[in-house]
């Protein structure tokens, strides 16, 4: 159970949400110029609190205090997207500050909904993401990993809270995947961990992340506003890890995780009003997922003397899915550099097909794509130049 914070002044009147958000934004920039971090008393025991307490309370109503908290956090993400990192950091600390205030002014903290814990956890995780800049405002005892641990702990405290679980599950999964990223880095750079298999260190966190991602991936047509390309960036960690250590997992497990990752990316842009830029990010992630799996089967094909036809069919299927997704991407962005990706896929198809006619057709399509890119001003690497010269000879 979370320890109670000192009771501050009670909220009284009601202001419009936007007025409150603007006031919070200004206060975040003003109050957080010094140290700021979550408190042990709030269940974030791995992080010291360097914030000066201020008993001047903002105005809250029962129905909108949590939405205001999310508003602050979302404003921080918008600032980050616009490369205003300092403002993003201020708003992240502002979110943590306001979460603390809500705790201080809640008589029964068990009534706080899951969305509160999700917002608090997401803000803590954002500190770890922006740690290089944020650490200027933190105590020396704080570390990037301590904020990830605090984010996990805060989200876990919300599992028994009332309310919808979607945002909380997303916050938990993201925090577990960031933990994977840090542990892989530590394994590569710290002698004390060098003798421990990296899978032993991180697989428990992978399993926990998947546990919370799976229900979010169900019903890919259902709109979920917190599921955005920005919130799904930790999925790159999962994809990269599984690709790097794919031989440690069963084919069934990899396929299962691939389907979850793909479903989440597609679900993030299911809203017809989704900006084209977000659609592009999501489709590129799906394409990366497909080509990664194609390479997985091609590697198996290179090292197997049995089930050759089955592996060829599986690799071809993933490569054809890749072509379909590339076509979707090219309708969104016709940058000539993208033609080189199409050429790569076609060359992979040529590598695995068994009849010469199909092979020659794929090589021709690859060559044409490279020439089109070159004709549009793309500077080719020596490998592409060599391929075009060899095929055209």
From Swiss-Prot:
Pfam families assigned to the protein according to its UniProt record, in alphabetical order: Nro1, Nro1_C
Biased composition (Polar residues): 32-47
Primary localization class, coarse: cytoplasm
GO-annotated cellular components: cytosol; nucleus
Annotated region described as Disordered, given as residue ranges: 1-51
Subunit details: Interacts with ofd1.
Similarity section: Belongs to the ETT1 family.
Protein name: Negative regulator of ofd1
The organism of origin for this protein: Schizosaccharomyces pombe (strain 972 / ATCC 24843)
UniProt lineage: Eukaryota, Fungi, Dikarya, Ascomycota, Taphrinomycotina
Gene name for this UniProt entry: nro1
């Amino acid at each position: 159970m979370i320890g109670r914070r000192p009771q501050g002044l009670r909220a009284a009147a009601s202001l419009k949400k936007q007025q409150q958000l603007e006031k919070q934004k200004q206060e975040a920039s003003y109050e957080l110029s010094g140290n700021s971090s979550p408190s042990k008393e709030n269940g974030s025991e791995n992080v010291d609190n360097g914030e000066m307490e201020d008993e001047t309370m903002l105005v809250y109503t029962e129905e909108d205090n949590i939405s205001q908290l999310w508003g602050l956090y979302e404003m921080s993400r918008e600032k980050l997207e616009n490369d205003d990192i300092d403002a993003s950091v201020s708003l992240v600390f502002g979110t943590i500050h306001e979460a603390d205030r809500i705790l201080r002014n809640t008589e029964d903290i068990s009534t706080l909904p899951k969305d509160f814990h999700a917002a608090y956890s997401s803000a803590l995780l954002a500190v770890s993401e922006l740690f290089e800049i944020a650490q200027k405002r933190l105590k020396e005892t704080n570390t990037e990993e301590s904020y990830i641990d605090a984010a996990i702990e805060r989200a876990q405290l919300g599992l028994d809270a009332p309310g919808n679980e979607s945002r909380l599950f997303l916050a938990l999964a993201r925090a577990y995947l960031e933990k994977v990223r840090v542990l892989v880095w530590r394994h590569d750079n710290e002698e004390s961990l060098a003798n421990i298999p990296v899978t032993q260190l991180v697989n428990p966190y992978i399993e926990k992340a998947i546990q919370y991602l799976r229900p979010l991936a169900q019903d890919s047509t259902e709109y979920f506003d917190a599921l955005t390309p920005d919130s799904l960036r930790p999925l790159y960690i999962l994809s990269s890890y599984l690709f790097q250590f794919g031989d440690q997992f069963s084919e069934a497990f990899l396929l299962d995780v691939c389907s979850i990752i793909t479903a989440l990316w597609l679900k993030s842009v299911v809203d017809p009003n989704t900006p084209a830029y977000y659609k592009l990010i999501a489709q590129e992630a799906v394409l990366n997922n497909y080509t990664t799996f194609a390479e997985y089967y091609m590697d198996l094909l290179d090292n197997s003397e049995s089930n050759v036809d089955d592996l060829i069919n599986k690799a071809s299927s993933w490569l054809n899915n890749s072509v379909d997704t590339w076509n979707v991407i090219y309708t969104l962005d016709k940058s000539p550099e993208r033609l080189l990706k199409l050429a790569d896929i076609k060359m992979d198809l040529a590598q695995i097909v068994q009849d010469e006619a199909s092979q020659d057709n794929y090589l021709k399509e690859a060559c044409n794509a490279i020439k089109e890119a070159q004709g549009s001003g793309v500077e080719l690497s020596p490998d592409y130049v060599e391929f075009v010269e060899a095929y055209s000879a």
